[in-house]
């Protein structure tokens, strides 16, 4: 099995609204393996680096303020096709456009409070994982049911 990894963050609104267990459960039920997990209140510097691609956008300041306003649950998930699958589990950025059954479609209402962040590609995933986690914070392990998750 290809050991692709992605970065997922439950934003302060998702933590405050009590969705941590439900969101983790959706990824586990899908068959992905959690290899990194921590809860923290991000510094402004971390938030600015994370969302640096939006630095020139008018909403950048509000986004940084929001992400650093409360606890975030930062995670690294591993599995075959995890980046694309995670994006599908999460749903569209705008909750009103997100399909029912997705995390945002079921739980979010407002684009500025859309519960969760997920890496949008391999390069982004690597950047975000390296930004939020040190190598020693990531756990290499095998699930007892790994042979039942994939043919490879």
Curated annotation (Swiss-Prot):
Belongs to the NDK family. GO terms for biological process: CTP biosynthetic process; GTP biosynthetic process; UTP biosynthetic process. This is Nucleoside diphosphate kinase. Its main location: cytoplasm. Major role in the synthesis of nucleoside triphosphates other than ATP. The ATP gamma phosphate is transferred to the NDP beta phosphate via a ping-pong mechanism, using a phosphorylated active-site intermediate. Its EC number is 2.7.4.6. Keywords: ATP-binding, Cytoplasm, Kinase, Magnesium, Metal-binding, Nucleotide metabolism, Nucleotide-binding, Phosphoprotein, Transferase. It comes from Prochlorococcus marinus (strain MIT 9215).
